[in-house]
Swiss-Prot record:
Quaternary structure (record): Heterodimer of AddA and AddB.
Encoding gene per record: addB
Protein name as catalogued: ATP-dependent helicase/deoxyribonuclease subunit B
Annotated function: The heterodimer acts as both an ATP-dependent DNA helicase and an ATP-dependent, dual-direction single-stranded exonuclease. Recognizes the chi site generating a DNA molecule suitable for the initiation of homologous recombination. The AddB subunit has 5' -> 3' nuclease activity but not helicase activity.
Binding site for [4Fe-4S] cluster: C794, C1115, C1118, C1124
Amino acid sequence: MTLQIIAGKAGTGKTTHLMDEVGEKIKKTSKTYIFIVPDQMTFQMETSFLNKQNLAGMLGTQIFSFSRLAWKILQETGGLSKTFLSQTGIEMVIRKAALDQKDKLKIFSRATSKKGFYSELAKLFKEMKQEEISVDELEKSAANLSTSVSSKVHDISLIYQKYEELLAGKFLENEDYLRLLADKIIESDYLNQTEIIIDGFTSFSKQELTVIEKLMQKCDKVTVSLTLNVPEIHKGLEDFSMFKASTEAYFALLEMAKLNKIQVEPEKILLENKRANSDSLAFLANAWGDNKYSSYEGGANDLTIHQANNRRAEMEGVAREIRQLALNGYRYRDIAILTRNIGDYDILCETVMESFDIPIFIDKKRAMAKHPFIEFIRSSIDAILFNWKYEPIFQAVKTEFFFDVAENATIMRRKADILENYVLENGIQNKWKWEKEGDWIYRKIRGLSTNVLPQTDEELATQSVINEMRNLIVEPLSTLENNITKAKTGIEFAMALYHYLEQVKAVEHLESWRQVAEENGYLELAREHEQAWSSISELLDEFVEVLGEEELDVNSFSEIITTGLDALEFSLLPPSLDQVVLADMENAKLLNMKVIFAIGMNDGVMPLRQKDKGILSDQDRDSLRVENSNLKPSAKNNIGEEDLLAYKIMSLPSDKLFLSYPAADEEGKVLSESNYLRKIKGQFKNLNESVYLTDPSLLNDKEQSSYIRSKQATLGLLTSQLQMYKRGYPLSNVWWDAYNSYFEDSKESEAAKQVLSSLYYENKTKPLQETTAKNLFGENIHASVSRMEKFFSCEFQHFAQYGLKLEERAHYKLQAVDMGEIFHGAMEWISAELKRTNRDWGNLTEEECRQMAKLAMTFLAPKIQHEILLSSKRMEYIQYKLLQIITRATTVLNEQAKSSAFRPIGLEVDFGLKGDIPPLKIPLQSDSELLLQGRIDRIDAAEQDDRTFLRIIDYKSSSHDLALTEVYYGLALQMLTYLDIVVTNAQKMIGKTAEPAGVLYFHMHNQYVQAEKELSDEAIARELQKSSKMKGLILSDPVAVSLMDTNLEKGKSSNIIPAEIKQNGELSARSRTATKAEFDKMRRFVRQKYQEAGNKILDGAVSINPYKLKEKTPCQFCGFRSFCGFDPSLASNQYRHLTNEKTETILTKMDIEGGTQ
């Protein structure tokens, strides 16, 4: 029994030497030669053996990792009777242990609910087993340390002991196999007459060293290769040496041999770099291996450093280099891309390499958490825990496992959308509402539902869909909840979940998806669907094995299962024979690589700016290591490991090394280059440095040609180059050749035309054809005033809402429009009640005003937005605040009525074909008509001296005034339209003609009075009355004004209307008035605006043409903005800038444009 150490720096041929030596020995002896390599290296080592002529097909060689050797020996000697626990199972058991000990924990009681806590604990427990650290040793190390450290160790010990208790006698984890292997090696016949060759390790855990010690005692010979700087062996250990770990291993092996009286053969030291095929790469590897600063004066064509604008530009630059290497004869399998942060590059790399038609293998396991099946299970459990709230329910619905497998998925998705809309609109947020007996009733009601009509056929059809989908969810989810609620033990919980998955036919869903993916050539996706079910089956099996007899509650079950789900990962297929590999620098074990791309070489990444993370902080570790040196050192002591990682990269390729870094991240944050790159630049005087450009136009023709990739991917870049050409920049012939190539192939030309058409893209709409317009809007247009205002705001907004009939999704929340409905409804109810009891607004007492307001709110509250005002304490408070506003408004109207001769003659008066007043008919082109319909809040009338006056009052929940500029541009037509309608129909309404008295806005709000000194009650009342003054436009007639405010005195301003009387009895300039002639001009003009709008609608006007008046624009609150794509930065998208003009100018324009009709 002997030990031999093969030592040398990276690239000196240690692995090749060992393989050649075994190749020679195997010809002369019947011994078995076993190679032990790291897990990540086994596949490549097997491939190397197959490709090695003197070893190919040799039966006397075997390749194992430590864990695979353990399986082999334990199969032979016994020891596999216990159940193996996966990483998922380990984390579930740790969570169970932590939950059991939660009340005893001093530090980690809150952390038990945090995601990631259990994976960190699993890492620590793994370290303790690998380094053979017992709980007693850890507690002893912490005995004299600070309270925070000793409390952490106390918690770790409690959880670890419970964890071991749960595993005891029944289960094994990976680290337990090495312990069993060490015990069973002596009994193995398989290891008789064998030589062990250990290669590819930079260090060994204490557990691995124990296994090696047992192998030394059993096997004929143990050979270990170590990457060392040989002079350091004899100088002794340096704290920050990159070879510290391997030097420690070297001395540990010699010490073990000495203790076990194992003969040590002379060590073989390899000094010559046999890997690097160029002087520059050989110099780089040697310089870094010696850790000495020296400079290289020669050419360095095989070593380059590249900067890129961002990670995408970097990845595309790498892809272009790989394409060129392939053209020069390199195989893809000769090339590897290494990165420190594979999570920053994996998806990007896959996308970019696909666009360049480069086969890529990404050496990273992907979490299973986002797979629909995993999400379905998690969301279903959350739905039960959180009383069937909307979010988890519909997260589960959208995975499609509730759907009938036999139904068309597209139809089922549409039905699910209908259900979701209903749930959101009706505020269905708990189990009681979901399981309530009877069908859900669907009515398309907006605002107040004071007059509910019978359901239409369309509503009944929608209701049927809603209840169909509701039942698909409620039945299985209720069964799951009932079973989980009854469950007491782990096995009962697992059975409840398994039966639920059976009930929704999860296997059939996954199998159906797998078949579809396979038929469409998505083989990896097909494998994922297959793995998802097998992983869940294994997870439940492990759960039952470990916790089947344990008593649990619903919360504990949820937490443990969620931990298991979080730990699930998709397994990796080994790479094909010819693929580029993307791998993580730290874990990659690569052999025979000719070209290496080291990407993301930024400061803080290489070397890594260590963060204090994990269960034990750096300070904790430093303190504990004083007593227990087996514990891994703190991150701040890992400088040597960072240098070793960089050295591994520098010495890995035989032919070429490309180093690159992005200058900014995705958000534009500046990133600087690694210090390692600065060091290399200082060493190499003739180093090739360049930039991976996003825009190739600055390069020569040959360099630009490297940007040409697959036809599909090149289209985007070609488009951007042609865009630059359009702006006057020169265009290389490379791009004209690419352009022509698309139109030589009829299959490609259509796609090319579609993409290249973006060069001439303008975000403009074309007018609808006449027949289309009439199909959408009708021969005669039935419209409201607000609709016409919307048309003048933006034609496309009108088209989207009234032509395409698009609607924003309704949510169960009280919005401004709902409050407006309540205010209108309250005023209507109070007025109707006064009329019914033959009372007048001006005769009410203050107490009667309060009572009226309260009764109105009591009547209206259940009738707004599916009883939203009755749904919660918060809504109860909002109802109280709304009542205050209604009460205040009632009081103000009462006060105003006492000082006014005007009285309401109509409230919520409908005009239209079925209204109290006929529609306003506007003649349009081609014998069509525009029929205006709507509802007028309030019509007031007053009489004096055989003159009758009519005015319009509109209740508003926010402050409004009549701006003639907005009237002129068609943005505020409502009030003057209503006035026109009532004056025109006065004979029908009141049996006589009438004059327009004005239009006024009544602001419904709860006013506050601000004063610098204390005010009397009378003064406060006066101030409140002033703040309630109505805004708008009134007739400049002393009679009309005096009827509106009977208390208005000379030299005073009205507290009711926008009028002020001068001392001479005339209206002041501060009054908002218009003459009857001016009102008539405005009425004619408004009709003309409707005619203009109606004709344009019939002409198919759908332009994206929002206005801008000062800072006001319809886009601010438009729900269709993402749909129309309006972008003011485009020349084709500009606002219609409207200007404010003087009243006289506006009236003159109205007179000219309004005609004489």
